[in-house]
Amino acid sequence: VNRPELSEKTIQAICSGAPAAAKKFIATIAEQAKREGVIVAIDGYTTANWTVFINLLAREITILGLEWETIDSNKSTLKDGKEIDAMIDPLLIWDTKIDPTLLYGKIYKGGYKGLLDEEKVGIFRKTVPAAKAPGKVVIVYGYGCLIPELRDIYDVKCFFDLTPKTSMLRIRRGEYSNLGKERPDAINRVIRRCYYCDFENAVHNRKELWKNNVPDWYFIDSDPGKLQMMPFATFADICAQLVKYPFRTKPCYLEGVWGGTYMKKLRNLPKEMRNAAWVFDFIPMEVSVLVKAGEELLDINYCSFVHKEGVNLMGEDCVKKYQGYFPIRFNWDDSYHSTGNMSIQCHSGGKFNIENYNEFGRQDESYYVVVTGHEAKTFIGFRDDADIPAFFKEIEAADTEHKPCDYMKYVSYEESVPGLQVMLPAGTIHSSGRNQVILEIGSLTIGSYTYKMYDYLRLDFDGKQRPIHTHLGELNVRQDRRTSVIHDPQSPEYIVQKPRLDASGDGWEEYILGENPQMYISLRRLEFENRCEQDTKGEKFHVLTLVDGEKVRVRSVEHPERHFDMDFMEIVCVPADMGRYVIENLGKEPIRIHKTCLRDGYQNDPA
């Protein structure tokens, strides 16, 4: 939980509970409603649920002896479902030979504006103002109703926000229908369309609203039983205070067939969880940030915070380069005491991702080994003697004829030890082997372009054969990344590097573990006994992970009260604007901290 210092005014402005929020909201507009009428607009992030709040508003309005009317902006302004399908479906891959699970598609870039029916909008812009009258409240609701083309007709503007986890859970419960749909489709289809259209529209809409400070009221809809409401200025102040501190995001945990038990035990996860294969500690599009505000605990969508405080958080150059998105993602892959390896896989490069998915660029990753058991291995690159055409034939046979592939003949590996760092630029064949926990650090993509090339003929939890992406894998895998090449300091494919000292001070040393011109991140390790001094210089954020030791405090030099205490295997972000900061050992063991930042010259990095 993050505990920035907030003013009493900010704390008192937060209203908790839908009934109390409705009562307070109506009190702020009652006089205007009596005198001339009020048009209220309620927009929100994908799956936002404003139904209960609107019903409570209607009750409060009736108690005051006023009239009310509700208008669904999506039904009133969007093209019909068939027209929207005709726009979005061609962007999605429907060939199961290419994409067996129908995961992929192209990002729709038209926004809510591109889905509008111009004739309907013309009528809407006349009928909504015409409905306004003294003694009446008109409530307009719908995704995208606050876009520039519509917003000037409203008097009061609201935005319902929620965490990505909450949004995904609502989708999986069948509570959401894609834009233009009357009812929910199959869950996987709803999710794919959200990734390539609905989420994308919502994120860009919210980003523009934040930039121009459009909303009057901000709502947190993550807990249906505890709606939280505050003036948008209050939300902005909370973000402005939080970015002055080192902070941690709220993790998400996912099970997987190759998942292990280490993180489940370390973090006291529920016994009914089979495992925790993936721990999304700091994946920007998936996490939220918990903020303590008086007695209230606010669970804020991380991207909402990023888009409000982007420059202070990431630095101006980073905001420009990555269009306001946080450009690095962090998660744990846990195969400790598991049933097997992660799949043999690769990811696609920039040209492929841009042309086929409308993405930002390539999907790079890296692995840092933190915990190992017996015989743990990290697979990376092809062996020098690998017959790659033969490998392709074997994985094809595994996929179509269910014949096992002798992958050890083809794929190179490192003996895993704590502290091993490998870089995985797009196209590198790789896998995290059984019996280890790795810190995975990757580049910015909206989707996840993981092409499983071999998965040991393994069944998923549903008892079905896990799908293989041999076609996409063969198109993208880099055949030149072989054992000798990836270890050669003279090679541009030098991605298994030896640590080299980069900086030192009183009792501390900083090593570069991995830097390569093909990747825009710099992977480092801080080593010290007592304390270590660092400086963001107001230019780059730092992401710190305690990979050895008990507990440390990360604090500002100029403002020591601005600090965060992090435990073993926690991940903390130090905002670019912090400047000089100190990491202090609060335990007795020597400290090792993994540090990630943007590589010098990242501004000129190609896609």
For the regions a protein language model found, what residue spans apply to each?
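Ligand-binding loop in jelly-roll beta-barrel domains
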Residues: 335-341, 349, 372-375, 428-447, ...
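Transition-metal
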Residues: 212-389, 455-498, 523-525
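NTP-dependent small-molecule kinase module
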Residues: 1-35, 52-65, 165, 172-177, ...
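Double-stranded beta-helix
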Residues: 176, 379-406, 439-484, 587-607
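ATP-dependent small-molecule kinase phosphotransfer cores
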Residues: 2-21, 66-137
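ATP-dependent NMP and nucleoside kinases share a basic, alpha-helical "lid"
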Residues: 124-180
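Glycine-rich phosphate-binding P-loop
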Residues: 40-58
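Short acidic-glycine-tyrosine-enriched beta hairpin
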Residues: 410-423, 555-580
